[in-house]
């Protein structure tokens, strides 16, 4: 009987701890979060849903000397609560607003190397998303 009570308590605690694990495609406002292309993401409270639909990387490879450093453009489609499309750039448009949400591009990795082709699915886009108050 003692073993049965221990087993039941263990099962109960396991179920409770599973509820506290973060959902893989969710993010928290005000923090730097990493995102992939074509992933569908939503805020922890489900007040915002979006996906990254394009990444255009024209940065100068780290092992090459260039006149211009280049830039990366990231296209984001916001699906709810309002719909809209924004393009954030590592060069001249690092912040944009859709509805009452501010999107800021922090980084795009990996950084290009002249001898390696980066596949779109290998990119990691770091964004900071803030819910604006009225």
Where are these regions (language model features)?
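Sec-dependent N-terminal signal peptides
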Residues: 5-14
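Bacterial Sec-dependent N-terminal signal peptides
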Residues: 13-34
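Short acidic-hydrophobic surface loop/beta-edge motif
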Residues: 37-45, 94-99
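Cysteine-centric segments in proteins
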Residues: 44, 50-53, 58, 64-65, ...
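Mature extracytoplasmic domains of secretory-pathway proteins
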Residues: 48-94
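C-terminal partner/receptor-binding element of secreted or periplasmic proteins
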Residues: 110-134
């Amino acid at each position: 009987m003692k073993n049965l009570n221990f087993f039941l308590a263990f099962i109960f605690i396991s179920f409770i701890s599973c509820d506290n694990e973060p959902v893989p495609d969710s993010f928290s406002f005000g923090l730097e979060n990493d995102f992939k292309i074509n992933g569908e993401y939503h805020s922890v409270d489900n007040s915002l849903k979006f996906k990254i639909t394009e990444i255009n990387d024209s940065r100068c490879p780290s092992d090459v000397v260039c006149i211009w450093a280049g830039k990366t453009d990231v296209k984001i489609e916001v699906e709810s609560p309002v719909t809209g499309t924004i393009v954030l750039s590592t060069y001249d448009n690092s912040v944009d607003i859709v509805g009452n949400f501010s999107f800021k591009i922090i980084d795009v990795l990996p950084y290009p190397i002249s001898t390696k082709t980066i596949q779109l699915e290998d990119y990691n886009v770091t964004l900071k998303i803030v819910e604006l108050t009225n």
